[in-house]
A protein has these predicted regions:
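Short extracytoplasmic
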Residues: 45-70
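Generic detector of multi-pass transmembrane helix bundles and their immediately adjacent loops
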Residues: 301-453
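Cytosolic-side membrane-insertion boundary helix
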Residues: 275-304, 323-324
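Soluble non-transmembrane domains of integral membrane proteins
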Residues: 35, 39, 46, 60, ...
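Cytosol/matrix-facing amphipathic helices and coiled-coil assembly/linker segments
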Residues: 20, 41-43, 53, 279-285
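Glycine- and acidic
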Residues: 23-27, 286-296, 395, 399
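Hydrophobic alpha-helical transmembrane signal-anchor segments
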Residues: 2-28
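Alpha-helical transmembrane signal-anchor/signal-peptide segments
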Residues: 26-50
Length: 453
């Protein structure tokens, strides 16, 4: 005959397995709602412009080379092959001031920015002696700026030269589909002092702004009103300052660090913008309640297990029996906490939603247990204990770097409490089936383990 303790533990483990079903459904709901938010970001990007990645400015020198080849009949055929030579700047300085605004669509929101980017660029005198051949025709060079999304171009000033040059749409290079270019002349490039130019590009975008540091020496300065930037990328800023009013950051890099010049060393280089290193600043939400809710749900099974353990100890130490249905109802209330948290966080923010959900579920469980455990004080103690656990969970969620330390300390404290309460308990007596069927003499109370002994 199996002991009572065996069947009790087996039942509790079975109930915890059952609770895995709504927990899995909760994770699915969180993924679904997070997907809705991402679709909103996509809709805003489609109606304005997406994340911007700026490549340039650089100078492109097109030239046509005539090659004589024999065809199948042995006749000489002249083929004209189009080539491009790329000239990278000696120095590149960009000063940007994007202003961020929050755009809402329903209950979701995303960040869009718009602001000027002031470019100052210097090119050295190029070596073009190898193009002075009879079979080579050099075309008109042009200055090129490539973008991820040309819809974000709000305005562009003329290229600052002794004689200003207006920009034209398009890149003129097949591998770079979106951008602008300004026509130049070979005489401009062959000056001993090189080519110095400046211009201002007013650009709009969403989510992030990146600049590929093409110059032998490159520098980017950004100043914005968004107080929650993310600088993760190929290069961290050398200087940064983040306040409640916004942020400022400065990046510097050279060819020694980024080796970008090697990507343009040969003519007709295939330019893959996404693979080139870049200075990047992203606009992030101060609190991602979907991510926090997902992390909270990962602790759900632990919370349910701790609550069931508390019930089990209460049964063992007091002799008052708790039915498995009562375990199941309390477990359902614990799972409902996370659904309430997710639903309210979309409207009230994570902190207020967490407070409301924890008070509501703790109060509901406390009210129910005051009847199930035959004592208002017992129900209040369980509710207070749950509130304490929810408080610890909130600290775990807010302090991701210290979550492991806090979690280990919590588990140690719980284990120590269990060992302290059960240090004098005779588990063989608890496991004895006769303990539930023996009769107690009239007028004599059944001996029980007392917490205060």
């Amino acid at each position: 005959m199996k002991s009572v303790l065996f069947w009790k533990i087996t039942t509790l483990l079975g109930l915890m397995v059952v609770m895995l079903i709504p927990i899995a459904q909760l994770m699915s709901v969180i993924d679904e709602r997070s997907g809705y938010r991402q679709s909103v970001v996509g809709q805003v990007s489609e109606s304005t412009s997406g994340a911007q990645r700026v490549l340039g400015p650089l100078i492109v020198i097109p030239y046509v080379e005539r090659e004589e080849k024999k065809d199948e009949k042995g006749q000489t055929v002249v083929q004209r092959v189009q080539h491009y030579r790329y000239l990278l700047p000696e120095s590149l300085q960009v000063l940007g001031a994007p202003k961020v605004e929050v755009r809402k669509l329903g209950i979701y929101q995303t960040q869009v920015y718009q602001g000027p980017l002031n470019f100052k660029v210097r090119f050295g005198q190029p070596e073009l002696a190898d193009l002075q051949r009879a079979n080579v025709t050099v075309g008109q060079p042009f200055l090129l700026v490539a973008l991820s999304d040309s819809r974000g171009i709000k305005s562009i000033s003329p290229l600052g030269l002794p004689q200003p040059v207006a920009f034209e749409p398009g890149t003129g290079v097949g591998s770079l589909r979106q951008g602008i270019h300004a026509p130049l002349t070979l005489a401009m490039l062959q000056q001993k002092e090189g080519l110095n130019a400046d211009f201002t590009l007013t650009l709009a975008g969403t989510s992030s702004l990146s600049l590929v540091p093409l110059g032998r020496s490159s520098e980017l300065q950004l100043q914005s009103n968004w107080p929650h930037p993310n600088f993760l990328g190929n290069f961290l800023p050398d200087e940064r300052k983040v306040t409640e009013q916004g942020f400022s950051a400065r990046w510097r890099s050279t060819w020694f660090a980024n080796n970008i010049n090697s990507a343009f060393y040969y003519d007709d280089a295939i330019i893959d913008e996404d693979k080139l290193p870049a200075f990047s600043a992203s606009l992030v939400e101060p609190v991602d309640h979907y991510q926090l809710a997902e992390r909270a749900v990962k602790y759900a099974l632990l919370f349910i297990g701790l609550t069931f353990m508390a019930f089990f100890l209460f049964e063992t130490l007091t002799g008052l029996r708790v039915h498995p249905i009562q375990y199941l109802l309390v477990g359902a209330a614990l799972v409902l906490f996370y659904l309430i948290l997710l639903a309210f966080s979309e409207h009230l923010g994570f902190a207020f939603a967490y407070l409301a959900a924890s008070i509501a579920c703790s109060g509901l469980i406390g009210f129910y247990l005051s009847a199930a455990l035959r004592g208002k004080l017992r129900g209040a103690l369980f509710a207070a204990s749950l509130l304490l656990l929810y408080g610890v969970l909130y600290l775990l969620l807010q302090s991701e770097d210290n979550a492991l330390v806090l979690g280990a300390g919590l588990l140690f404290a719980i284990l120590a409490g269990i060992m302290l309460l059960t240090r004098k308990l005779d588990w063989y007596q608890v496991a004895d089936p006769a303990r539930l069927t023996k009769e107690t003499p009239a007028g004599q109370e059944e001996p029980r383990f007392r917490l205060w002994k």
